[in-house]
Amino acid sequence: MSKLISFKDESRRSLEAGINALADAVRITLGPKGRNVLLEKQYGAPQIVNDGITVAKEIELSNPEENAGAKLIQEVASKTKEIAGDGTTTATIIAQALVREGLRNVAAGANPVALRRGIEKVTTFLVQEIEAVAKPVEGSAIAQVATVSSGNDPEVGAMIADAMDKVTKDGVITVEESKSLNTELEVVEGMQIDRGYISPYFITDSDRQLVEFDNPLILITDKKISAIAELVPVLEAVARAGRPLLIIAEDIEGEALATLVVNKARGVLNVAAIKAPAFGDRRKAVLQDIAILTGGSVISEDIGLSLDTVSLDQLGQAVKATLEKDNTILVAGADKRASAGVKERIEQLRKEYAASDSDYDKEKIQERIAKLAGGVAVIKVGAATETELKDRKLRIEDALNATKAAVEEGIVPGGGTTLIRLAGKIESFKAQLSNDEERVAADIIAKALEAPLHQLASNAGVEGSVIVEKVKEATGNQGYNVITGKIEDLIAAGIIDPAKVVRSALQNAASIAGMVLTTEALVVEKPEPAAPAMPDMGGMGGMGGMGGMGMM
């Protein structure tokens, strides 16, 4: 397929046009008074959203050269979302401002390479400044971060704070669509295993169709058990201890299963069994997780352990075990969760997570960390209409991601104030730059950092330039509260941003801007010409009557 090629100013102008087209559609969604964007869908009703990344992903421009610019900004938004979970609109606005000011200077004769180098140096300095001013998240700040990121919805803020309190920062919190009108929080405390009881004859509560054990012992093995003789020693020891027994094995069948069911029915031993979760190497790893959490050992021939020699101190223990048809929940004591073994295991899993390139593996590792650390919470989102439901779900996902980012790297004053304070520190840093063009780059960044606050104010119907000047005159945590329309202490007012979100937005915007400024040629696919329309066939004259063809 043939290509379109453009060079120098022409190529950069095309990129800028595409960047502006996408950024102008995204920027209006910024802040608690951000406007909505209606997205037409090929199938179904249009979607009304107030989420920058969703708008960015939908945009495809007809001009291939301009579309290349739009794709670059999509990359900024996607990368920021991937790293910090929020801040996509802020990153887009900063990138647009950097490109606009940068290209203006390149057109005036500035060296693009020197500008890029200056942008990189200043960005590195500003990232260090963000780390220096960030404060750890404490108490009500978690709810405040979530409230701000959800479009100022206090109910969502309180719900996310409650979920994080219950499952800890290592727990898994997921967002699902509910069939009801209400948004609710469900928390599964303890380790959930996606396997249920092997036989319904183990059920202890026939009304609820589940098995409930208090203070059970847990036998964990990767073996398939079919002969009861292997289990007799451990069953006798558990019977003497007078406690329930939960068996987790690859499978239990035949004579072994029948004997366990009979003993349970006769009241000789309170016992139940489930199959080991997962498959292959992951199964061994999950069994080891269960063993570490419950203080037991995995009985495996791989390490020289056999079932007929198991002692009570090799069995795990839990405060409670609940077995349903399809899943099991083990609640370990607080002392077990706080043990050195669990902490070491979580640390090891974090290293595996960092080293993994597979999204699937990362998801599974994160689930394992959550089950060891605290549990799993599900926020079920409800709304009156499908359109409102999707918008609300996007807001809650943003809020959840922002909250996790805040816990990781701390918080800074929100409302674009931190960016204004950073811009004020650039002047003193300029002395460390090598030449005038790098200092021009510093001025470009300083101006670009004002753009998010300017847009926040504009979306609220206020003159952005006036608000920017007022915030510049203020000090410390004083900034513009869009809700009240006043300059006040934003930390005290709960208007806070995760430091990770601000950092990621700045770094990703600077990266793309540097690339655009140093682009000298643009090579894109030439669009295929539209296929000619079919000619009008008219009424196919001359076919009427068809004389002489009469039927006898």
Swiss-Prot record:
The name on file for this protein is: Chaperonin GroEL 2
> According to its record, what are the GO cellular component terms?
GroEL-GroES complex
Which reaction is this enzyme known to catalyze?
Answer: ATP + H2O + a folded polypeptide = ADP + phosphate + an unfolded polypeptide
Annotated NCBIfam families: GroEL (TIGR02348), PRK00013.1 (NF000592), PRK12849.1 (NF009487), PRK12850.1 (NF009488), PRK12851.1 (NF009489)
Which EC class does it fall in? isomerase
Example of a GO biological process term: chaperone cofactor-dependent protein refolding
What EC designation does it have? Answer: 5.6.1.7
**Chain coiled-coil ranges:** none
Localization recorded for this chain is: Cytoplasm
In terms of domain of life, where is this protein from?
Answer: Bacteria
The species this protein belongs to is: Synechocystis sp. (strain ATCC 27184 / PCC 6803 / Kazusa)
Q: What job does this protein perform?
A: Together with its co-chaperonin GroES, plays an essential role in assisting protein folding. The GroEL-GroES system forms a nano-cage that allows encapsulation of the non-native substrate proteins and provides a physical environment optimized to promote and accelerate protein folding.
Please provide, alphabetically and separated by semicolons, the GO molecular function terms listed in this UniProt record. ATP binding; ATP-dependent protein folding chaperone; isomerase activity; unfolded protein binding
**Keywords annotated in UniProt:** ATP-binding, Chaperone, Cytoplasm, Isomerase, Nucleotide-binding, Stress response
Query: What is the gene called?
Result: groEL2
Q: Which family does it belong to?
A: Belongs to the chaperonin (HSP60) family.
